[in-house]
Amino acid sequence: MVRYTPVNGSMLEHQKTSPWPTNCLPMFEANPTRPRVFGVPLGVDFPQALLDGILARLDPERPDAIAKICLITATTRMERRLTDLLRARGPGFLPQLHQVGNLDGLIPLADVPAADDGLATQLELAQMVRALLKTDPGFQAESAAFELADGLIKIIGEIAGEGVDPDLIINSAIAEHHSEYWQKSRAFLELVQGYVAQSGKISTEMRQRLLVEALTVSWTQNPPNHPVLIAGSTGSRGTTRALMALVARLPQGAVILPGVDYDVGPTVWDTLQHAKIREDHPQFCVLDVAQRLGQEPGEIPRWTKDNAPLPARNKLVSLALRPAPVTDSWLSDGPHLKDLDKAVAGLSYLEAPSSRIEALAIALRMRKAAQDGLRVALITPDRVLTRQVTAALQRWQIEPDDSAGVPLSQSPPGRLIRQVARLIGRDLTSSALVALLKHPLVNTADRGEHLRHSRDLELDYLRKACPVPTLAGCQKWAEKRDGSSRMEWVDWIWSCLQPLKNVTTDQFEVMLARHLKAVSDLAAGPGGETSSELWAMQAGEAASATMAALEDASSSGGSVTPTEYQRVVESVLSTQEVRNPIVPHPDIMIWGTLEARVQGADLAILAGLNDSVWPEMPAPDPWLNRDMRLAAGLLLPERRIGLSAHDFQQAIASREVLITRSKRVDGTETVPSRWINRITNLLTGLPQDGRNKLAEMRARGNYWLDLAEQIETPRGASPRAKRPAPCPPVSARPRQLSVTTIEKLVRDPFAIYARYVLGLRPLDQLDVFPDAAMRGTALHEILQAFVETTKEALPGDPEAHLMEIGAQILNQRAPWPATRALWTAKLRRFASPFILSEQDRRRFAKPHRTELRGQLLRSSVGFTLTGTADRVDLTPDGRALIYDYKSGATPTQKVQDKINKQLQLLALMGEVGAFMDSSTLDVEATAYLSLNTADRMKLHSYKPGEIKEIGREFDRLIAAFDTPTQGYMSRRIPEPDRGYGHEYDSLARYGEWEDSDPPVPVDLTRLEARRDP
């Protein structure tokens, strides 16, 4: 056993003999003259080459020798791959595997404190940041405090990981010359630095550096005599580089770098060493490690004798990706490239018109590879594209092995948690309530009954002009449905959601407890089922663990608003991922660029190669600009691009590669990745028939693009629809219509057919928004109430009386304060001219009835006409004036005579006494009362016998539609400004035919007869 005691804080020393075996066989020559660094060429399967090199250096007579090797890998996935390769060789020993990010196994008893709970620290810092933002509101919104705290934690962690003194940045001479914005940023950095110093907490990056320092002391004093290897890392972090330097100098230590480009010449290496902007080159990471270890990058020995599988392609790509200062070498070195045929033989290039077609083409190629028994890997950082490819593969019931899984926020438990969080402190909307009730994890105990209630509530209440759902409204719906179970169900919903409504500002832990209780109660259902599916399966377990961690840290959250709380929950959930529980296809994989470094496939598909996607543009740093980072020794934004370029260079070195990109994404034109531009530009200018080679690459890619477009194109020519004019049996035609729908019968008979023959009615909107129709309805009610209350005489101040009634009705009809204010202003502008015109009307007639309903049976055609007169006035001699309120533009008299017969038919109903509780009316005139102040009232007086002629015209219209051969033509007389988009235009397939096309009658009586037994 090894015991370590602290010396000078983090310094460690041995107290007993090292546990490592002393009879280890040497893997390398003892006492190296310089640090050992090896490389593996581009295109070589790195884990396989690593294992081959280890076994080649061991005594085959000592199978246990590998067990004495300490192997430090870059990632868990690489460790897993090595284990799989060793197991595939049969029974044997495994090396002692560790990871760069987890060194505790190398110093099990190190006196290094554990890293602090990052979530609790972030919540505490968010409080401090929020307080600082209150003093300077212009810097950022207070609701962004949690995200700003996360950014500060990351930069402090980076400072610790790179071993930079924070005071060097805060008190930097460069910073003194920067803008006022930096002075604000410095205040935040000082805040975090003071918090870290006072709390004594250490971040994960700081702990990692302390472990490396402890390991350095331990191995410097007592160097291990067994082999120690660090493999697969490019030293992108300062702590990792320090560990690599330590291992490379051990007597039996070595560093093995992946993806070394052995075609880079001295000129390029020299350029990379002296160029100002050099970190975006794919081999800069190799150069940086080599320089820090005192090694010339061009002299790095190979770990094995394996050569690159496609040296010609490596040379081509290496030349294409040379730094900008030496791209003139394309002209000198390009013509000397050999074996261009071999370089591009397995390379295909596909440019799709859209990301959807790109995803389908990729899915087709992956399906073909699986059919041929090949291992295929889709490599891309674009998670939207990977989801599209996954969806496309489901066409053939193929589930890919996605290394990234699904974000927890997109899983069923994550979505439910987010949906409920969005309800805290907000008014419940109909759409939010329906989405919540239809969530698959809500009320899983009695799901069938729950879905029936949800559907009925939506159709009977939420879609019936319900601006804001209320408990009273839901209870009224339940009473109408006459079911105790529905009332219990409604009470359960509101018992879950009511505690969330009136929350303003509260302690984070209180808000979290209220939130989680609502989520659990919704999942349990009215019966309080404890065994709900919310926390079950992988996604549920991950959600439970994440929310438990948030609960543990919640006491550090302080006082937050609902918006701030929601952003915290969203941020925490988005950082976690869940693996798909469905067993995937073993040979169809989706990798990120990091996974592609340590695994191999027969076919690599490099997708989403657009600039800003691959490579991804560095995110703006709100704290330090590039000059300050450079002066402090922190990583530059270009380093991330360089690492991404290194991943691309390794992936394109595979034997068979398909490169894809989409020309447009979400309707926006894209730019090809800079690496693709370089390769295509180089090929275009090569004299070795490079232009034709590029054309061959495109042709191979276009094969899959053509397949994708073919699979999306319907087979055979689909005939265009004709302008419909269905002729249903007369018995199926409507025998009753209202006066307002007669215009529809004249203008668009097909709409009458769809609504009254087929029984198709569009669903009402789920969320009611204030629009012109709703405003017109409200004004209609206001005027009706005004007339009812002033029948006998106008009050002394009629305008004030109108505004008083308007305030009462708008409070009910317009629950939105801003809308209510706008409509009140509209009413105030309308009130004065309306009162003046009302005074004129009452000089020759007085209000008699409002909302006068009636129906008229025309026995000659067996048809019932229904209608409602908004207002009927009587003159002193008993003659009637019929008015109809119109919120839109009033139709001209010509339109009323030919098409809009509403007022004329109301006059007909009045003349024959069709209105309820009313005798026959001697109708003198009709008019529209415009709710628009710009329109004046225009009375239409009827001549003797004119109303009777209106009745005869109506009978002729109905008789015409009672003719079996008369079809219900679509858009017979379309409204001038209607265009496309009427509720039944899609059913009529308008757009496949034009308004000038003749109608095609379709006799439906034969279909009716065929259905009869």
Regions found by a protein language model. Name each.
Residues 2, 6-793, 803, 807-813, ...:
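Polyanion-engaging groove/track-forming segments
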Residues 525-527, 667, 716-1013:
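RecB-family 4Fe-4S metal-dependent nuclease core
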